């Protein structure tokens, strides 16, 4: 019996795949547990339409990520931070991914989820720093930060 997998089934198939499986297995397990449905012409047509719309949506997301990358990596787009600095040259506060995301929104109107900013640890130094950002699985960018001493 041909079935369309609705979810990943270990050892049998991934979501969206059309495969031939034994009749009893399909009826008694896959279809009962809503893991698959029978591959009728109508169901296959629906699947193809759904896959096309998902591909279109993925292409739109990729184009948007590339546009944001271009905007982030412009030379004049440098995030400005002013922090108090102690005698050892380290800032009193730290600059976290959340702060960077908020400043991007405030200074340039670019909304990025803080989880996409790849900061190993909060920044506590002054100067020019580049921080990597994962905008899409295929698109990475660098945010330029300029951290100044508030006493200057």
Swiss-Prot record:
Listed GO biological process terms: translation
Keywords tagged on the record: Ribonucleoprotein, Ribosomal protein, RNA-binding, rRNA-binding
GO cellular component, one term: ribonucleoprotein complex
Molecular function via GO: rRNA binding; structural constituent of ribosome
Domain of life of the native organism: Bacteria
PROSITE patterns attached to this UniProt entry: RIBOSOMAL_L9
InterPro entries found in the cross-reference section: Ribosomal_bL9 (IPR000244), Ribosomal_bL9/RNase_H1_N (IPR009027), Ribosomal_bL9_bac/chp (IPR020594), Ribosomal_bL9_C (IPR020069), Ribosomal_bL9_C_sf (IPR036791), Ribosomal_bL9_N (IPR020070), Ribosomal_bL9_N_sf (IPR036935)
Matches recorded under Pfam families: Ribosomal_L9_C, Ribosomal_L9_N
HAMAP family: Ribosomal_bL9
Family classification: Belongs to the bacterial ribosomal protein bL9 family.
Function: Binds to the 23S rRNA.
Protein name according to UniProt: Large ribosomal subunit protein bL9
Species whose genome carries this gene: Streptococcus thermophilus (strain ATCC BAA-250 / LMG 18311)
Gene name of the record: rplI
